[in-house]
Amino acid sequence: MKREVKKVVLAYSGGLDTSVILKWLQDEYKCEVVTFTADIGQGEEVEPARAKALALGIKPENIFIDDLREEFVKDYVFPMFRANAIYEGEYLLGTSIARPLIAKRQVEIAHLTNADGVSHGATGKGNDQVRFEMGYLSKDSTLTVIAPWREWDLNSREKLLAYAEEHGIQIEKKGKKSPYSMDANLLHISYEGGILEDPNAEPEDSMWLWTTKPEDAPNTPEYITIGYENGDPVSLNGEKLTPATMLETLNKIAGKHGIGRADIVENRYVGMKSRGCYETPGGTIMLKGHRAIESITLDREEAHLKDELMPRYAKLIYNGFWFSPEREMLQAAIDTTQKNVKGSVKLKLYKGSVMVVGRSSEFSLFNPEYCTFEEDAVYDQKDAAGFIKLNALRFIIAGKARKK
């Protein structure tokens, strides 16, 4: 028996899946639907979603289209990059980090419109259902969550198309459809499905939409300088940029040089392994630059502890725990380390690679007087003998005990 819901806020893209969901909610739940379309830099026009929603009977006052690009980068991407977060050593969490923001805004719109439910288009097999719903529940557990993919029998594209045709849902024809399931925002674009379901099959070159094939990238390297303050990139080649403009600009520069591709088999939170290909050009540069500026501004033990915490932090984001107290606790600790992460990093971009070639900071802990290979007057090398002996004391004691 279906729960009674009067008004539902749907995360709506205007595409086939969410347009079918919109109509299905109206028919199955007999409820009023509010559509929410987030512009987080996915590269598609979001206004057509308004026309599609109107055509499906949504009242103009129940259509929300919000530009969240600056908030997305400033309050979600940048904090994540302060942690140098990478899931399972390769994934820069481009999809994972976008879902909490969308979920949060859905709940806010539910409160604005007096809605008593929220809905999303994530399937029952993937991680996104968890990410959306953990966000909903953390912000307002009284809202009814409707996940159509866990309820209906429209479990194929053919069935969705048939439903759309039967109910007069206009689906734009864009020529040959990509064989991949794709998701994009300012941080990345992802590809799943198709031949990628064979982990041994190499995808065709035409799949990659954001980055030049590294072999075809410019034959001349490009040098850029990123300025950092409190761990965040704030300027490019001396020009101050907003967070969203910074990431957008780095995407274009890095993409031209074939930087940021990844082909990964990852462990989903729901238990299965999944293969995905990702392009994260600007994020790849930001991560490299951030680690470089940290290398001269963080204390050794501070940096090492931060690296130990990073996998746990990344796992929390991947699994949908952005709003959890443990993620917020880790974030507070991470942000404390960033107060002196200020300076500039020079990077060399060339045919798919990004290399740090310079770094400087007024808070640099790198002191040439101590680390020089030439003669110095500040470091007595004889002191190293006692340091080594004390550190090896437990080995010495254990060795003597074993000889008894």
Curated annotation (Swiss-Prot):
Keyword Chloroplast tagged: no
Subcellular location: Cytoplasm
Gene Ontology CC annotations of this record: cytoplasm
Entries under InterPro entries matching the protein: Arginosuc_syn_C, Arginosuc_syn_N, Arginosuc_synth, Arginosuc_synth_CS, Arginosuc_synth_type_1_subfam, AS_cat/multimer_dom_body, Rossmann-like_a/b/a_fold
Signal sequence extent: none
Presence of keyword Nucleotide-binding: yes
Any one GO MF annotation of this record: argininosuccinate synthase activity
Coarse class of the protein's main subcellular location: cytoplasm
Ligand binding (L-aspartate): T123, N127, D128
Keywords: Amino-acid biosynthesis, Arginine biosynthesis, ATP-binding, Cytoplasm, Ligase, Nucleotide-binding
One example of a Gene Ontology biological process annotation: L-arginine biosynthetic process
EC number: 6.3.4.5
Pfam families xrefs: Arginosuc_syn_C, Arginosuc_synth
UniProt-annotated binding residues for ATP: A11, Y12, S13, G14, G15, L16, D17, T18, S19, A38, G121
Substrates-to-products reaction catalysed: L-citrulline + L-aspartate + ATP = 2-(N(omega)-L-arginino)succinate + AMP + diphosphate + H(+)
Pathway where it operates: Amino-acid biosynthesis; L-arginine biosynthesis; L-arginine from L-ornithine and carbamoyl phosphate: step 2/3
Binding residue positions for L-citrulline: Y91, S96, N127, R131, S181, S190, E266, Y278
Family that this chain belongs to: Belongs to the argininosuccinate synthase family. Type 1 subfamily.
Subunit structure: Homotetramer.
HAMAP family assigned: Arg_succ_synth_type1
NCBIfam families referenced in this protein's UniProt entry, alphabetically: argG, PRK00509.1
Protein name in the entry: Argininosuccinate synthase
